[in-house]
Amino acid sequence: MKEYQVYLERARSRQQDFLYPLIFREYIYGLAYSQNFNRSIFVENLGYDNKYSLLIVKRLITRMYQQNHLIISANDSNKNPFLGYNKNFYSQIISEGFAIVVEIPFFLELSSSLEEPEIIKSYKNVRSIHSIFPFLEDKLTHLNYVSDIRIPYPIHLEILVQILRYWVKDAPFFHLLRLFLYNFCNWNSFITTKKSISTFSKSNPRLFLFLYHFYVCEYESIFLFLRNKSSHLRLKSFSVFFERIFFYAKREHLVEVFAKDFSYTLTFFKDPLIHYVRYQGKCILASKNAPFLMNKWKHYFIHLWQGFFDVWSQPRTININQLSEHSFQLLGYFLNVRLNRSVVRSQMLQNTFLIEIVSKKLDIIVPIIPLIRSLAKAKFCNVLGHPISKPVWADSSDFDIIDRFLRICRNLSHYYNGSSKKKSLYQIKYILRLSCIKTLACKHKSTVRAFLKRSGSEELLEAFFTEEEEILSLIFPRDSSTLHRLNRNRIWYLDILFSNDLVNDE
């Protein structure tokens, strides 16, 4: 680890060509293993213990030294001289090494920014999941229009590498990265399909997440720049910004560029109440003003993806809807703004008036059907929601089986405590409860009724329904009216760091 830190200090003074040698260092792979991102990447399936093998890494580095100068042609692509005989196994190890190495420049930039307070302002747009909750509670009810946008995947993963090259100037490293990706990911096709991207993301999660998140951050940095300068922009002058070579020069000398090139297209366009929220691959664009301005921003998104990232997206895929008539999905919730109408009688002197008051209320609904679909995918129930046993857990002890089911139930209750109607979670708890009982009965080779009668486990399984109330009673006074009121209100817990694993907003 000391050698790693010394190399980082040397890399601070060298602005380029410092990543390539790291891929041949053994301690890089040891660092990847110590982070325990993928427990099985350093283990050959030969019956040995699941431990980090320095011999495997030495063998891999030797092969890379011998073969990294080769350029694989179309005739030799099937032989795969770069990865050797055990392609999938070595590819996973190299992928982890690439993921560690490529994060180093950004770690250096972040650590240097922490030493200089004025640079921290560049990271002010970085927010956690907790910043979304106040937006939902405080801002959403005051907005009228919303656009639910799915950020498209790039048409080819080569685009991700090219975006990264603008920030990291290390040509040998990127040549080696391309050589690895072309061999392992089959990038010979002109268009990378969504299925191949999904396969790559599952087999190399860390490297893919880094490349994809960097792509999203790059798109957001340009979007936020355009958002801040929107008073100077017009649609027909917007595409000029996608010349990558001049983009940062234009951003630094915005006034001079506008005065020289865009003086004939300057118009006033400002929407001070437009809000942008993103989580994972979905973003929400909301505004209080007329849909005309929202339509402007929709075309900005289309031109941004097509002209800068070579991502084809059609305008009809982005819909602009009224919040009062449309619900959208975010963070595993269904959200809509409901209009509550009430009539108030007002009297002035001898005249009486009926005044209609319209108030907005935010409804945050638990998506029961997607949750049941996720439970069915995880083999807790069938597609109709009927509970089934979990035979793969039957080898564990009774306590471990019950604890696993309780942990899932606890996480779901904890995460969805911000919903308006928490009683809808009882159906999910019921499925998990019966699935737990059927799993225990399957383990003991008995029926559900006979197992419950013999073991008396029914009282223990009541924890599926009582645990959340016990947690609240530890925080708040043990008053039935207080707990009943808290059960109706939304509570956002601060220990929620990511969306629930059973929630998939694809």
From Swiss-Prot:
Main location: plastid
Keyword Plastid assigned: yes
Location(s), subcellular: Plastid, Chloroplast
GO BP annotations listed: mRNA processing; RNA splicing; tRNA processing
Pfam families in alphabetical order: Intron_maturas2, MatK_N
Keyword Hydrolase: no
InterPro entries recorded: Domain_X, Maturase_MatK, Maturase_MatK_N
Keywords (A to Z) from UniProt: Chloroplast, mRNA processing, Plastid, RNA-binding, tRNA processing
Gene Ontology cellular component annotations, sorted alphabetically: chloroplast
Residues forming coiled coils: none
GO MF, one annotated term: RNA binding
Its job: Usually encoded in the trnK tRNA gene intron. Probably assists in splicing its own and other chloroplast group II introns.
Family classification: Belongs to the intron maturase 2 family. MatK subfamily.
Protein's name according to its UniProt entry: Maturase K
Provenance organism: Melilotus indicus (Sourclover)
Taxonomic lineage: Eukaryota, Viridiplantae, Streptophyta, Embryophyta, Tracheophyta
